[in-house]
């Protein structure tokens, strides 16, 4: 193991002791938000320290096997133990290197998911509905909670635009690479000649800020409009001006919410979406600056990039960023998104490891 890696691991051992002490402090326990953040960090640090301790034990086992090898009667046993210890040491070193890669602090957060129909008219709107269903089914598999915040329905079904909140552990870490252009190739239900049409949707995944990260909004920079909600929402949906639209005048960013009968709650949710969009705008600008010096295959986050094609006649999904092709489109559209998510995460980790090797 490299000396620099050992120094990093020593810092994690010390940090684990600090976290144990902090989490036992009554003052920390009274701060629910701070306690949750420290608890999440404790889980992460504990996993690293556990592997570090196992690595140290296997190093001792390897040294003991080397001593045993000098005894002819124990040489065969020593060789077997040395091979076992070395194999586990190699595996643990790889795991530790991966765990010590730079972490996106937003990975643990819940998200706002935005899907917008693009080229393709009604077929694009129908595909937006299919994408929402795919992400909803995936969230159900993960035990996450999905809350529809606003939707603009199309005439034939689907959505011109839909915004949902997905709440749970590490939602952003799983879904952040979904941002970008999604292209679909299939025969629309309205097509009488059996011709394959191509249409597209844009997906944006925004990390939900916590209270400590909340963007400060100047009331003078906001225009708040109320209107009657439309679309699916129950029998009371059109009776009051409960829907809220908030415009951030300096940037032109807009957020709206119409899912609740309470105007007050809709306003609070719309403000949360607006804060996430402003924070995401800063993130994208920062990534654009970084991209000027380092081209990242996976993490560019450019919403104009076509990242994926869904070819229904062939049952094929292709992610163009990592040249991934899977012939299991039906299962993926039904929420089995892990094969795609894990491949993207692995590709990004490989990029980071390569950067560390170069550095």
Swiss-Prot record:
Methylated by PrmC. Methylation increases the termination efficiency of RF1. It is found in: Cytoplasm. GO terms for molecular function: translation release factor activity, codon specific. It holds the Pfam family PCRF. Keywords: Cytoplasm, Methylation, Protein biosynthesis. It comes from the Bacteria. The modification N5-methylglutamine is found at residue 235. One of its GO terms (cellular component) is cytoplasm. Peptide chain release factor 1 directs the termination of translation in response to the peptide chain termination codons UAG and UAA. Belongs to the prokaryotic/mitochondrial release factor family. This is Peptide chain release factor 1.
């Amino acid at each position: 193991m490299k000396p620099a890696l050992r120094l990093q691991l020593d810092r994690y051992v010390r940090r684990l002791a600090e976290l144990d002490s902090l989490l036992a402090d009554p003052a920390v326990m009274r701060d629910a938000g701070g306690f949750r953040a420290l608890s999440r960090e404790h889980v992460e640090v504990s996993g690293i320290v556990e592997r570090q301790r196992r690595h140290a034990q296997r190093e001792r086992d390897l040294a003991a096997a080397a001593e045993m090898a000098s005894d002819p009667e124990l040489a065969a046993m020593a060789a077997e133990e040395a091979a076992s210890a070395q194999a586990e040491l190699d595996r643990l070193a790889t795991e530790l290197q991966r765990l010590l890669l730079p972490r996106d602090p937003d990975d643990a957060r819940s998200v706002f998911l935005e899907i917008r129909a693009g080229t393709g008219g009604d077929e694009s709107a129908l595909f937006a509905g299919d994408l929402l269903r795919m992400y909803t089914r995936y969230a159900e598999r993960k035990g996450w909670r999905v809350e529809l915040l606003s939707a603009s329905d199309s005439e034939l079904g689907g959505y011109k635009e839909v915004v949902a909140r997905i709440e749970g552990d590490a939602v952003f870490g799983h879904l952040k690479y979904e941002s970008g252009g999604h292209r679909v190739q299939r025969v629309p239900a309205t097509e009488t000649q059996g011709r394959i049409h191509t249409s597209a949707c844009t997906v944006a995944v925004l990390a939900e800020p916590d209270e400590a990260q909340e963007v400060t909004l100047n009331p003078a920079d906001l225009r708040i409009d109320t209107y009657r909600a439309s679309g699916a929402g129950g029998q009371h949906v059109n009776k009051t001006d409960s829907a809220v639209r908030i415009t951030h005048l300096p940037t032109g960013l807009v957020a709206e919410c119409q899912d609740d009968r309470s105007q007050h709650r809709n306003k609070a949710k719309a403000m949360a979406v607006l804060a996430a969009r402003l924070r995401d705008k800063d993130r994208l600008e920062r990534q654009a600056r970084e991209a000027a010096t380092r081209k990242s295959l996976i993490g560019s986050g450019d919403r104009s990039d076509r990242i994926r094609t869904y070819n229904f006649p062939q049952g094929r999904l292709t992610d163009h960023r990592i040249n991934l092709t899977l012939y299991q489109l039906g299962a993926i559209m039904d929420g089995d998104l892990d094969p795609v998510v894990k491949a993207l995460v692995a590709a990004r980790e490989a990029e980071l490891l390569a950067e560390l090797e170069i550095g």
